[in-house]
Structure formats: structure tokens, C-alpha cells
Amino acid sequence: MKMSKNVDGVKVQNQGDLVIYNGHKYQYNKDITSILFMGVDRDKINTDEEYLKKHGAGQSDTLFLAAVNTSTGKISLINVPRDIMAYVKTYDENGKYSGRKLRQLCLAYAYGDGKAKSCKNAVDAVSKVLYGIPIDSYMSINLSAISVLNDAVGGVNVQVIGDLTSVDPTLKEGANVTLLGGQAETYVRSREFDPL
């Protein structure tokens, strides 16, 4: 039984099946299936090498881990902050592995091809942050998917949390608005206010 100490007060045993924290033991639930959802800060899918060289793969600015209990049907969403510092697999400009380096978690996606390699690198980094928890599947979307997903559910109702009239006159602070089409992307991309 190999034991490794990851951070102060935390020990992991049995390849992540058992985590000991502050003297309490937490056993991994085998009925949980986990899916990492990533929102990537690119306008289009990086399908050609020229685009990738010019613009890069992008960063996974939004990371959510869905934990699905296949026995009970319960789904829990865990927001994984993009700015967590993690040891990320890095690659040089030729794609050659150059070791794990301490980087913001969102950069794990950037060390890839904007497709499966990027996603798998992000999955690896998130798993490491969460003490080796297995991540069974992943899905990434880019910015162009926001309006499509929004419209697929008939729009999203929001109370505007900051004055965004400079980008859309209907987005007045405090207004209740149903975001439709590209308006949803405009809203989530706006950085003119800090909701915290």
C-alpha cells in the first residue's frame, strides 16, 4: 500500500481510492462517474495548424466537474477555479514534452492542440489538483457555442448585475432580461464589472 503526502495534512492511498485529511478517511465512491466540462476562450474550433500557430489552443477559462452518482441519479457540480496553481504537463513549440511546471490550471488546455490533446492535458491537471480522482469523460466548448446552447433552452433569464449598456442598451443594471442569441455571449464575456 503506497502512501504519498500531497499537501500539509492530506495523504492519498491506493491510487486515490482513499484520502486522509485531518485524520478523517474518505473512500472513493465507485458509483460516481465524473465529467469535466471546459469552456475555452476561442471563437472557433482550432482545426488547422496555421490557426493554432497564430492564435494558440486557448485556455479553459471555465472548468466544472460533474459528479454523477449512477446509483442515485444525483448530480453534483464542482466549480474548479481556473486560477488554481497546479503542476501542468508542458510542451515546447514543437510539441515535445518539457515536464510538469507550476502554472495556472487554465493553461493546461493551452499546452495542446485545441482538441483531444488539450482536453486530456486539462483532465490530467484537474485530476492531480483533486488528489488523483479519476475523471471518466470530458467535453469542451468554445465561445461560439454559448448562443447555441442558450437558444436551445429558450434563453436564460438573468437579473443584470452590472451596467452593461455600453455593449448592449438593454443590459441595464438590475433589469430582468431573457438573454437570446448573441446577447448571451455578450453578457458572459463582459468584464466591465466585477460581480464579486
Where are these regions (language model features)?
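Non-catalytic, solvent-exposed segments at the cell envelope interface
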Residues: 1-196
